[in-house]
Amino acid sequence: MATATLTLFLGLLALTSTILSFNADARPQPSDEDLGTIIGPHQTSFDDEIGIVIGPHATVDDEDIDMDMGTTVGPQTNLNDDDLGTIIGPEFEIHKQDFPADFIFGTSVSAYQVEGAKKGSGRGLTSWDEFTHMFPEKVQQNGDGDEGVDFYTRYKDDIKLMKELNTNGFRFSISWTRILPYGTIKKGVNEEGVKFYNDLINELLANGIQPSVTLFHWESPLALEMEYGGFLNERIVEDFREFANFCFKEFGDRVKNWATFNEPSVYSVAGYSKGKKAPGRCSKWQAPKCPTGDSSEEPYIVAHNQILAHLAAVDEFRNCKKVEGGGKIGIVLVSHWFEPKDPNSSEDVKAARRSLEYQLGWFLRPLTYGQYPAEMLEDVNIRLREFTPEESEKLRKSLDFVGLNYYGAFFSTPLAKVNSSQLNYETDLRVNWTVITNNLSLPDLQTTSMGIVIYPAGLKNILKHIKDEYMDPEIYIMENGMDEIDYGTKNITEATNDYGRKEFIKSHILIMGKSIRMDKVRLKGYYIWSLMDNFEWDKGYKVRFGLYYVDYNDNMKRYIRSSGKWLSEFLDSKETLHKCYFEGHREKGYAPKLFDVEYLEPENSQLSYRSDFM
């Protein structure tokens, strides 16, 4: 490699130092007619409330990428380990044996994204079925999760892939409507769905892989959405309690790690303020094609009801004998790390802190201290629901662990102007998240295709932040991974040569080791997103995260990528980790860049770049 090219690679992350078995015969059984189909308009007013999010996308040109994705990833540079060199400064080596003996190394998926089997399996319809079929133009290339990647029928083979990776954990979600097609027990239990999850859990355990279950990963039963508006109505709390209790009693003797919700902030903001994800609600001024919604009120109502539903599920968990003997329950929150755009600006420093409170603190403060962050109480004011004294007291005891999804960082600076007549989450936040910095010592910032700065040191920082600010909880990293755009131009060999993703994973594992050793963070596990390529929500199948490449054009065959091969060797104790592109030494100012990127400026936005995760 040319010296000039290598020099370009060695430039950024200066910031990088730092869940009573039921009698099946007694259960009400739904008929096939009850389940219905998604084809054609449903004659209910709720369907008319689903808004348009993204215009038609029929090709794979750069212009088709959603503006909020921030960047597109160009041709990947062909690099070898010899090009890496070593980190100048204090040497820090990590072996698999350096992690605690009970540490979990695993992969993550969610039901709608991978399972498929929408028809003929008894599963009821979800808000995402509605979202993708009533308005296919909202999803890249008109994609949907009808087939996913056929995990429902291939799970045994996919567990073999996990074994190939030498992982000992697998995080998945349970589809509410695969168990309760209409959302409640009295309306019918789908025994085939119950059997599927029992078989999956048993197969995992038979292969030495610990299951970790998320109860809600953005799939709201369509029947409940149509009946009373889903999470817009507090009635959802008791229905979620019933669903959670069913799962604890059915699977809790074998599943010991439970999470109630995945990324409730994204579900609230993207689904009810931006209209970008199911159920696609927002104010007209936010997106003209949103037929109904209130961006100023609904995200906070939905978030509050998710917190109350979490509390109800925890109450059931604490009283369930099936989960006694080591069972834990928590929640999975997403947060970026935020640095001030200008490190010498006190206002930018405050903006970075404010961003953490609005993204992470929005849920973690009430779940730790019983109340919302002070900044939100002051600024969102009467639009933010209050907790009763009893709720606040219970909330303080409602987490056995914190699940963290971490993908990268942003630079923060205050918004110059806010329209007080058009309030939403972003105007309440009053912070611009950008990939641009005034720090001239950081010449080449590497971003992902979804517009997030790759910043492993941010993981160390946010783990330390959670330890210091939230009573030193046990933490599991439930998602961490790197995306890439599928232009449809690569052959299998090229598509599985993911050098950048390999370095991304290596760097974050190294950072985890530092966090455990140096900061004494109580980190218990690390799950990579994702085991394999899958349906990535409104980005469809165009964005890929998998350790395994899935060939959608050839019977969904799976092929291990370079990142998966490296992980397998590391977990088999054949790799010593001490050098990574994305992890460097602050004093030496490393800023490695692996991809050519083209920035796409969002249209009509107050924000320079906004992550699709919010």
Swiss-Prot record:
It comes from the Eukaryota. Glycans are attached at residues 344, 419, 432, 439, 491. Disulfide bonds join 282-290. It catalyses: Hydrolysis of terminal, non-reducing beta-D-glucosyl residues with release of beta-D-glucose. Transmembrane segments: none annotated. GO terms for molecular function: beta-glucosidase activity. Keywords: Disulfide bond, Glycoprotein, Glycosidase, Hydrolase, Signal. Its EC number is 3.2.1.21. Residues 1-26 form the signal peptide. InterPro entries: Glyco_hydro_1 (IPR001360), Glyco_hydro_1_N_CS (IPR033132), Glycoside_hydrolase_SF (IPR017853). A beta-D-glucoside binds at residues 113, 217, 262-263, 407, 479, 529, 536-537, 545. One of its GO terms (biological process) is carbohydrate metabolic process. The active site is at residues 263, 479. SUPFAM superfamilies: (Trans)glycosidases (SSF51445). PANTHER family: BETA-GLUCOSIDASE 33, GLYCOSYL HYDROLASE. Belongs to the glycosyl hydrolase 1 family. This is Beta-glucosidase 33. The lineage of its organism: Eukaryota, Viridiplantae, Streptophyta, Embryophyta, Tracheophyta. The gene is BGLU33.
